[in-house]
């Protein structure tokens, strides 16, 4: 019997750690909630959560030393980031008039424009909160195994990622205009939506990450 995949769930004072830990455990992972670089180094994979204000997230990461941990881990093991964790990978967020991020990926994080309109001509509400569909996935990639086109996932965000390299976009969502719902670059995978809150499809995606063999 093969051993469970060890996942370091990064704890820097932000993120719904309990929900993420419970969901990852439910799909067979051995989860350690940690900010200890030694525990992270010993893990098979890294899970990078995030909710709340970007400025607070970046400050929390720096104080806990998680920013350096992420930069080191990104080169040698699979990493999955969600929501603000995904946004933090880029260079700068528009939040608070401009907040520097980790600059692991080139690109920015602009705000949704409340003047945008949906397909019915109704102005969108900000934040984008609730269920929405994603599309444009490469279904030959194992991370999307068992996920259908137009699958529903749960979103809560006022900002969205604009990667400088469009080849990193792994899925799109539409909210007033199409935006990047997921990125994939080598061993780095990230989603704007919350898989741990997305029921069957979310658990399938987390299982795919746990099983992902690069």
UniProtKB/Swiss-Prot annotation:
Function as written in the Swiss-Prot or TrEMBL entry: IGPS catalyzes the conversion of PRFAR and glutamine to IGP, AICAR and glutamate. The HisH subunit catalyzes the hydrolysis of glutamine to glutamate and ammonia as part of the synthesis of IGP and AICAR. The resulting ammonia molecule is channeled to the active site of HisF.
One annotated GO biological process: L-histidine biosynthetic process
Domain called Glutamine amidotransferase type-1: residue spans: 6-214
GO cellular component: cytoplasm
Organism: Psychrobacter arcticus (strain DSM 17307 / VKM B-2377 / 273-4)
Gene, per the UniProt record: hisH
NCBIfam families named among the record's database cross-references: IMP_synth_hisH
Biological or metabolic pathway of the protein: Amino-acid biosynthesis; L-histidine biosynthesis; L-histidine from 5-phospho-alpha-D-ribose 1-diphosphate: step 5/9
Catalytic activity: 5-[(5-phospho-1-deoxy-D-ribulos-1-ylimino)methylamino]-1-(5-phospho-beta-D-ribosyl)imidazole-4-carboxamide + L-glutamine = D-erythro-1-(imidazol-4-yl)glycerol 3-phosphate + 5-amino-1-(5-phospho-beta-D-ribosyl)imidazole-4-carboxamide + L-glutamate + H(+); L-glutamine + H2O = L-glutamate + NH4(+)
Keyword annotations of the record: Amino-acid biosynthesis, Cytoplasm, Glutamine amidotransferase, Histidine biosynthesis, Hydrolase, Lyase
PROSITE patterns to which the protein is assigned, alphabetical: GATASE_TYPE_1 (PS51273)
GO MF terms held by the record: glutaminase activity; imidazoleglycerol-phosphate synthase activity; lyase activity
Subcellular location: Cytoplasm
Subunit structure: Heterodimer of HisH and HisF.
Enzyme Commission number(s) of this protein: 4.3.2.10, 3.5.1.2
Source superkingdom: Bacteria
InterPro entries for this protein: Class_I_gatase-like, GATASE, Imidazole-glycPsynth_HisH
Cited HAMAP family: HisH (MF_00278)
Catalytic residues, chain numbering: 83, 194, 196
Gene3D superfamilies: 3.40.50.880
UniProt protein name: Imidazole glycerol phosphate synthase subunit HisH
Principal subcellular localisation of the protein: cytoplasm
